[in-house]
Protein backbone atom coordinates (compact mmCIF):
# COMPACT_ATOMS: atom_id res chain seq x y z
CA UNK A 1 0.00 0.00 0.00
CA UNK A 2 1.37 3.39 -0.94
CA UNK A 3 1.04 6.30 1.47
CA UNK A 4 0.85 10.05 0.81
CA UNK A 5 1.08 12.99 3.15
CA UNK A 6 0.30 16.49 1.94
CA UNK A 7 1.15 18.91 4.73
CA UNK A 8 -0.59 22.01 3.38
CA UNK A 9 -3.91 20.33 2.66
CA UNK A 10 -5.71 20.08 6.02
CA UNK A 11 -9.03 18.46 6.82
CA UNK A 12 -11.73 19.12 5.59
CA UNK A 13 -10.20 20.73 2.49
CA UNK A 14 -8.44 17.45 1.71
CA UNK A 15 -11.57 15.26 1.50
CA UNK A 16 -11.71 15.20 -2.31
CA UNK A 17 -8.00 14.43 -2.60
CA UNK A 18 -8.27 11.71 0.07
CA UNK A 19 -11.15 10.05 -1.85
CA UNK A 20 -9.06 10.00 -5.03
CA UNK A 21 -6.18 8.44 -3.11
CA UNK A 22 -8.45 5.76 -1.68
CA UNK A 23 -9.72 4.83 -5.17
CA UNK A 24 -6.10 4.20 -6.17
CA UNK A 25 -5.28 2.20 -3.01
CA UNK A 26 -3.12 5.00 -1.63
CA UNK A 27 -3.35 5.91 2.05
CA UNK A 28 -3.70 9.62 2.62
CA UNK A 29 -2.06 10.42 5.94
CA UNK A 30 -3.86 13.02 8.04
CA UNK A 31 -1.91 15.33 10.34
CA UNK A 32 -2.93 15.71 13.99
CA UNK A 33 -1.41 18.13 16.49
CA UNK A 34 -1.50 18.78 20.24
CA UNK A 35 -3.72 21.81 19.58
CA UNK A 36 -6.31 19.91 17.52
CA UNK A 37 -9.58 20.04 19.46
CA UNK A 38 -11.27 16.79 20.51
CA UNK A 39 -14.25 17.56 18.27
CA UNK A 40 -12.00 18.10 15.24
CA UNK A 41 -9.87 15.03 16.10
CA UNK A 42 -12.98 12.83 16.04
CA UNK A 43 -13.99 14.12 12.62
CA UNK A 44 -10.49 13.81 11.15
CA UNK A 45 -10.01 10.28 12.46
CA UNK A 46 -13.48 9.24 11.31
CA UNK A 47 -12.66 10.40 7.76
CA UNK A 48 -9.06 9.19 7.79
CA UNK A 49 -7.43 6.21 6.19
CA UNK A 50 -5.87 3.57 8.49
CA UNK A 51 -2.87 5.71 9.53
CA UNK A 52 -2.45 9.22 10.94
CA UNK A 53 0.61 11.32 11.78
CA UNK A 54 0.70 12.99 15.20
CA UNK A 55 2.90 16.08 15.24
CA UNK A 56 4.31 15.80 18.75
CA UNK A 57 4.99 19.49 19.34
CA UNK A 58 4.61 22.93 17.86
CA UNK A 59 8.06 23.46 16.36
CA UNK A 60 10.01 22.93 13.18
CA UNK A 61 10.87 19.46 11.97
CA UNK A 62 14.03 18.11 13.53
CA UNK A 63 13.85 20.66 16.33
CA UNK A 64 14.89 19.97 19.87
CA UNK A 65 12.26 18.24 21.98
CA UNK A 66 10.45 20.94 23.92
CA UNK A 67 7.70 18.69 25.24
CA UNK A 68 8.22 15.84 27.66
CA UNK A 69 7.70 12.31 26.37
CA UNK A 70 5.05 11.96 29.09
CA UNK A 71 3.07 14.88 27.59
CA UNK A 72 3.48 13.45 24.08
CA UNK A 73 2.14 10.07 25.26
CA UNK A 74 -0.75 11.77 27.04
CA UNK A 75 -1.78 13.44 23.77
CA UNK A 76 -1.12 10.24 21.80
CA UNK A 77 -3.36 8.23 24.14
CA UNK A 78 -6.10 10.87 23.89
CA UNK A 79 -6.01 10.49 20.10
CA UNK A 80 -5.71 6.70 20.15
CA UNK A 81 -8.82 6.34 22.33
CA UNK A 82 -10.96 7.89 19.59
CA UNK A 83 -10.41 4.86 17.35
CA UNK A 84 -7.91 2.26 18.59
CA UNK A 85 -7.94 0.52 15.18
CA UNK A 86 -6.30 3.49 13.45
CA UNK A 87 -2.51 3.60 13.52
CA UNK A 88 -1.03 6.77 14.98
CA UNK A 89 2.64 7.48 14.30
CA UNK A 90 4.47 10.18 16.26
CA UNK A 91 6.91 12.56 14.63
CA UNK A 92 8.62 15.94 14.96
CA UNK A 93 11.61 16.36 17.22
CA UNK A 94 12.20 12.66 17.79
CA UNK A 95 15.69 11.79 18.98
CA UNK A 96 17.34 8.50 19.81
CA UNK A 97 17.19 9.55 23.48
CA UNK A 98 13.41 10.02 23.54
CA UNK A 99 12.08 7.27 21.31
CA UNK A 100 12.52 4.60 23.98
CA UNK A 101 9.93 6.40 26.09
CA UNK A 102 7.52 6.48 23.14
CA UNK A 103 7.74 2.82 22.16
CA UNK A 104 4.06 2.22 22.93
CA UNK A 105 3.18 4.28 19.83
CA UNK A 106 2.19 2.55 16.60
CA UNK A 107 5.24 4.12 14.97
CA UNK A 108 7.84 6.85 15.38
CA UNK A 109 9.04 9.08 12.53
CA UNK A 110 12.72 10.07 12.60
CA UNK A 111 13.07 11.72 9.19
CA UNK A 112 15.27 14.61 10.27
CA UNK A 113 17.69 12.28 12.06
CA UNK A 114 18.06 10.28 8.84
CA UNK A 115 18.57 13.43 6.75
CA UNK A 116 21.23 14.66 9.20
CA UNK A 117 23.02 11.30 9.01
CA UNK A 118 23.03 11.39 5.21
CA UNK A 119 24.50 14.91 5.25
CA UNK A 120 27.08 13.98 7.89
CA UNK A 121 28.08 10.88 5.93
CA UNK A 122 28.47 12.76 2.65
CA UNK A 123 30.45 15.56 4.29
CA UNK A 124 32.85 13.04 5.81
CA UNK A 125 32.98 10.99 2.58
CA UNK A 126 31.42 7.95 4.20
CA UNK A 127 28.77 5.64 2.80
CA UNK A 128 25.38 7.17 3.71
CA UNK A 129 23.52 3.90 3.10
CA UNK A 130 25.72 2.05 5.57
CA UNK A 131 25.55 4.83 8.15
CA UNK A 132 21.77 5.27 7.87
CA UNK A 133 21.44 1.50 8.27
CA UNK A 134 23.49 1.69 11.46
CA UNK A 135 21.38 4.59 12.73
CA UNK A 136 18.13 2.74 12.06
CA UNK A 137 19.48 -0.34 13.82
CA UNK A 138 20.53 1.80 16.81
CA UNK A 139 17.09 3.42 17.00
CA UNK A 140 15.37 0.05 16.67
CA UNK A 141 17.47 -1.29 19.55
CA UNK A 142 16.53 1.71 21.71
CA UNK A 143 12.85 0.98 21.13
CA UNK A 144 13.31 -2.72 21.87
CA UNK A 145 15.17 -2.15 25.15
Q: Model segments located where?
A:
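Active-site-adjacent beta->alpha loops and helix N-cap segments on the catalytic face
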Residues: 6-23, 37-42, 61-78, 96-100, ...
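Active-site beta-loop-alpha junctions enriched in small/polar residues
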Residues: 9, 31-35, 57, 91-97, ...
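C-terminal helical cap(s) of enzyme catalytic domains, especially alpha/beta-barrels
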Residues: 114-145
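Short, small-residue-biased leader/transition segments that mark boundaries at the very start
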Residues: 1-2
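Histidine/lysine/aspartate-rich catalytic loop segments that bind and position anionic ligands
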Residues: 25-63
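Non-cysteine beta-strand/loop elements that form the S-adenosyl-L-methionine
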Residues: 7, 50-57, 109-112
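Short beta-strand/loop segments at the ligand-binding rim of alpha/beta enzyme cores
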Residues: 21-31, 79-93, 145
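Catalytic cores of alpha/beta
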Residues: 36-47, 82-83, 90-108
Amino acid sequence: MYKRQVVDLPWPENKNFAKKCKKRSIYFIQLLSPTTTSKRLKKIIQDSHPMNYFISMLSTTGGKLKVSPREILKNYNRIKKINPKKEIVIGFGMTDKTIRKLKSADGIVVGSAICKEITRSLNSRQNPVTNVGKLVKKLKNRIAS
